[in-house]
């Protein structure tokens, strides 16, 4: 089973990781051979490079004692914002990454706060080009005493499809029932930061529901996620721990 899983991952280009500059980088290939690079910036901030394009997810300049210099990066073609909290939504970071051709894609609340952008609500779909599409999916809390953090219907997760490579960026959520509808995911970013998102037990349940080929726990703060690769080993999920504290 392990050899078969490795073979499938290799055929999909879902193997190997490398370091680029100051950030860990994982490189994947789409079925037609186009390269996709993921740079682990911080917490929930992800830089994605695809086919000459720059995609930034929830860019923030500062978190704890870590800072990100977005002025040293290329301007973004697309910026995705999941919700309004300060560890996901940073107006100044957006300004530093914007050019006249940049499209900012965000939920309704962030659109109001920013004053512009391509607004998406849960289940909206957006076709950006022949080979790029985005679907907004629910992201919310369900545990009693936590629902005020991320109420149902307000925030977004995103399924980003790049030349057939399906990437699930969950945003701040628990293991909600809607995850059963999320299928054929190649790469998933799932949050693990109690009490705001998932416990490690919830993340394992979510991973077993979604069954991504590769899983990056992210947004994990001080939560110990080191045991997740072992816990999900027999489920055929390649868990990669990067600096998404």
Outline where the language-model segments fall:
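Zn-dependent metallo-beta-lactamase
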Residues: 1-51, 231-235, 244
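Active-site neighborhood of phospho(di)ester-bond hydrolases with catalytic His/Asp-centered motifs
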Residues: 56-59, 76-87, 104-108, 168-171, ...
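Active-site HxH/HxHxD metal-binding segment of metal-dependent hydrolases
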Residues: 68-129
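Binuclear metal-ion centers of metallo-dependent hydrolases, dominated by the metallo-beta-lactamase
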Residues: 115-132, 152, 204, 208-245
């Amino acid at each position: 089973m392990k050899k078969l899983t490795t073979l499938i991952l290799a055929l999909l280009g879902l193997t190997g990781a490398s370091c680029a500059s100051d950030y860990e980088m994982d490189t994947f290939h789409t079925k037609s051979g186009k390269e996709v690079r993921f740079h682990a910036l911080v917490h929930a901030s992800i830089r994605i490079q695809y086919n000459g394009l720059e995609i930034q997810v929830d860019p923030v300049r500062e978190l704890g004692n870590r800072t990100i210099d977005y002025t040293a990066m290329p301007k973004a073609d697309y910026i995705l914002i999941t919700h309004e909290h300060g560890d996901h939504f940073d107006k100044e970071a957006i300004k530093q990454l914007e050019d006249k051709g940049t499209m900012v894609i965000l939920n309704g609340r962030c659109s109001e706060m920013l004053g512009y952008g391509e607004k998406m609500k849960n289940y909206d779909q957006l076709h950006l080009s022949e080979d790029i599409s985005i679907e907004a999916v629910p992201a919310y809390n369900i545990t009693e005493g936590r629902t005020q953090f991320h109420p149902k219907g307000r925030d977004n997760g995103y399924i980003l499809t790049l030349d057939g490579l399906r990437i699930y960026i969950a945003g701040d959520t628990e293991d909600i029932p809607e995850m059963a509808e999320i299928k054929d995911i190649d790469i998933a970013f799932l949050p693990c930061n109690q009490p705001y998102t998932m416990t490690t037990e919830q993340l394992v349940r979510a991973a077993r529901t979604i069954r991504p080929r590769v899983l990056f726990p992210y947004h994990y703060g001080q939560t110990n996620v080191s045991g997740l690769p072992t816990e999900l080993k027999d489920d055929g999920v390649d868990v990669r721990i990067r600096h998404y504290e």
